[in-house]
């Protein structure tokens, strides 16, 4: 289901984000290389929008989420958030500024069980977050907790239970409630429905959309499921080997996809309406190692349309050929390839 969102001034902006992890070897464990988990990611996130991030396993989706939440510091590039008076770099904030940032930006993880203390009642876990962020009045905290639980359709009496007493879907609702309790502006959701049954997935996704309508929250929704990404997102960012290769409106999939990787990725998604007519594009070769990524375009070793320039110069995100200002593609092709 496509929805439109006003793309004005970004709430959060990532420019040229890199994250390299050192590879060590030998007796002295000296650095012998680097894993380029993220290699120059540009991404704008707007108020009230959901941007879905998709790609194969190992493409850097989760690392990007952790960078945006500043759970890890980038090797290079800038992360800038609008605190109300314009964009400000969020790397290297002091303690007070960091708390102000974390009040505004929260992250939900794939496994909610590991994000709760198994020996702590869930009500106490949510209350602890409010105390950390300076809410001292117990009655005010309880009112806020009650409100957030009601938003995710969980009874207040459940707060006296322990994490193991809930189903996976209920724990994920409580993880969402914990984020909502401090009234953030942006929530980063990392594969939060991938471990749930399909029926429960639909409930959680519809819940997020309802919360967004009621609060105007922004979401970064990280997933490997293209269908889920299309349904929940206003825009979709496609990642390959640590880079964003295409950003396009969710309603533009699959017909307006331009990057060869995006087209190949979409061709592998079953479509009952095109059964027998749809041709799957099988990419040759394996995904290159992030330790020894190819020069030029990261997709050049597997792209069926590769040119000489692709092996030399790395393409940057530019306006796509459909001239939609919200559609960007990183590709040297002079015209988009014909999709499957």
Q: Predicted segments — roles?
A:
Residues 181-185:
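A short, proline-enriched helix->beta-strand linker immediately N-terminal to the Walker B motif
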Residues 78-100, 137, 253:
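ABC ATPase NBD Q-loop/coupling interface
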Residues 192, 196, 200-278:
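P-loop NTP-binding/switch modules centered on Walker-like glycine-rich loops
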Residues 4-10, 24, 28-29, 87, ...:
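Charged, flexible cofactor/metal-binding loops and thiol motifs
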Residues 162-166, 170:
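Conserved ABC ATPase signature
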């Amino acid at each position: 289901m496509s929805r439109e969102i006003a793309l004005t001034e970004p709430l959060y902006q990532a420019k040229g984000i890199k994250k390299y992890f050192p590879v060590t070897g030998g007796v002295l464990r000296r650095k012998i290389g680097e894993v380029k988990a993220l290699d120059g990611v540009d991404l704008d996130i707007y108020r009230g929008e959901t941007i879905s991030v998709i790609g194969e396993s190992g493409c850097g989706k989760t690392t990007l989420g952790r960078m945006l939440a500043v759970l890890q510091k980038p090797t290079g590039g800038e992360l800038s958030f609008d605190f109300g008076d314009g964009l400000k770099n969020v790397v290297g904030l002091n303690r007070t500024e960091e708390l102000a940032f974390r009040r505004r930006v929260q992250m939900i993880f794939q496994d909610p069980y590991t994000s709760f203390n198994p020996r702590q009642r869930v009500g106490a876990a949510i209350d602890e977050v409010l105390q950390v962020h300076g809410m001292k009045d117990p009655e005010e905290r309880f009112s806020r907790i009650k409100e957030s639980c009601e938003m995710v359709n969980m009874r207040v009496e459940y707060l006296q239970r322990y994490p193991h007493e809930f189903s996976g879907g209920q724990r994920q609702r409580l993880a969402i409630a914990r984020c909502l309790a401090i009234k953030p502006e942006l929530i980063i959701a990392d594969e939060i429905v991938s471990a749930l049954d399909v029926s429960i997935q639909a409930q959680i996704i519809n819940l997020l959309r309802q919360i967004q309508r009621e609060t105007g929250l922004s979401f970064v929704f990280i997933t490997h499921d293209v269908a889920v990404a299309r349904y929940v997102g206003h825009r979709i960012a496609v990642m390959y080997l640590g880079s964003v290769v295409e950003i396009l409106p969710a309603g533009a999939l699959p017909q307006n996809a331009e990057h060869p990787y995006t087209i190949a990725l979409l061709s592998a998604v079953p479509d009952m309406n095109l059964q027998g007519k749809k041709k799957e594009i099988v990419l040759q070769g394996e995904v290159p190692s992030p330790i020894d990524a190819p020069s030029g375009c990261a997709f050049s070793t597997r792209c069926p349309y590769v040119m000489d320039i692709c092996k030399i110069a790395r393409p940057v995100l530019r306006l796509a050929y459909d001239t939609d200002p919200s559609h960007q593609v990183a590709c040297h092709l002079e015209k988009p390839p014909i999709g499957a």
